[in-house]
Each structure stands twice: as C-alpha cells, then as structure tokens.
Amino acid sequence: MPTPTKGARLGGSPAHERLLLANLATALFEHGGITTTEAKAKRLRPYAERLVTFAKRGDLHARRRVMRQVRDNSVVHTLFTEIGPRYANRNGGYTRIVKIGNRKGDNAPLARIELVEALTVGQQAVSEAERARGTRFEARRKPTGATVEAAEELAQESPTAAAVAVEAAEPAETPAEGAAGKPTTAQTDDSGIGDDSGAGEQNSAN
C-alpha cells in the first residue's frame, strides 16, 4: 500500500479518502464554509484550492477535470461562474482555516474552513434563510439588561426584533403604583387600635 505524502490518510483506504475529500469540497463550494476536524480541514485546503485554480481557467478541459471530482452539476456551475471569476486577481490563498476548539464527546480538535472573500448571491440567500429560521421566536423575548434605545437599534437591523422594541417602549406598571390607592393592612390595624383606646378612655371618664 502506498504511503500518504500529504499527511494522515483519511478514511480506511485511498478510494475512501478521495470520496471524502470530494464530498468536503462540494460542501465547501456550496455553502461557502464548513466545520470539520482540523486534520480534514488541512487536507481539504490544497485540494479545494486546486479546484478553484481550474475554475479560474474556465475552459472545457478544466470543467471536465473538476467534474471528475465534484459530481454535483449545480456546484460545478457555481464554481465556474461565481467563485472562479471572484479570484481572477488572486494568486492562491482562496481559503482560511479557523480553529474553534475541541468537539464534545471525543475531544477531537475542530476547525472551520471557508472561502476568504464575500459569499455569492445564492450563498447569502441560504445564510439569511438559516438566520431567519434561528431568530423566528426572538420576538417573544424581552430584552434583559438593555435599554429601550438599544432595542430600537436592534429593531432597525432585524425586522423580527421590532416587537421587542415595542414591548420595551411600553411603561410597565410598578407594584407601588398599583397599591397606592389601597390602604395597607398595617394602616387598617393601627387605625382600629386607636379607635378602641379612645372609646375605653371615654367609658372610664363616664
């Protein structure tokens, strides 16, 4: 069996490693960034950047070379029409790796590998949809420890937080205001005690 020359082998066999890298590259070009183990991210980086170099060429032979590894036609189309032209004036360094700590459970070191420049239009739409799905129920929560001005600024940035600003702007009735018109039990007891003592003094005088 040939010895790997670019780091530890991924998977159980060379064929498994090729399929694993191809799937990771497909996910990277589709979403703009993925979270995986640090070892896989380091092996994926030169693999993905070589495919971006083929996409920058843009000819038919380069497209066929990429399609031997990336089998998703929509991802190949995105790679050649959006990602490749984006790096026309950049010679290498198309991705970055950010370490994000260890995974809970097996304590494997995790890393995020992503494309270095802005997302494409399709990737921005996907990220906005995921963000909207995650903040769908934020309107029911009241801001804790934040001022009304901060809530209004947040409402300008996110439409889903508009209800939060409206709820924060409404003045809440304090318990002191609600109990201002009602005499307390202590006051009632004191007044009753004073009346009984006065009546006792009048009876003794008579």
Swiss-Prot record:
Composition-biased stretches, type Basic and acidic residues, lie in 130-141
Alphabetized HAMAP family for the sequence = Ribosomal_bL17
Q: Name one GO molecular function term.
A: structural constituent of ribosome
Q: What is this protein called?
A: Large ribosomal subunit protein bL17
Region Disordered: start and end of each range?
Answer: 130-206
Family, similarity comment? Belongs to the bacterial ribosomal protein bL17 family.
Enumerate the Gene Ontology biological process terms.
translation
Q: Which gene encodes it?
A: rplQ
GO CC terms, sorted: cytosolic large ribosomal subunit
Family matches, as NCBIfam families? L17
SUPFAM superfamilies the record matches = Prokaryotic ribosomal protein L17
User: Per the record, where are the segments of Low complexity compositional bias?
Assistant: 160-181, 189-200
Quaternary state and partners of this protein? Part of the 50S ribosomal subunit. Contacts protein L32.
This chain's source organism reads Frankia casuarinae (strain DSM 45818 / CECT 9043 / HFP020203 / CcI3)
User: Has keyword Zinc?
Assistant: no
By its UniProt entry, which Pfam families does this protein fall under? Answer: Ribosomal_L17 (PF01196)
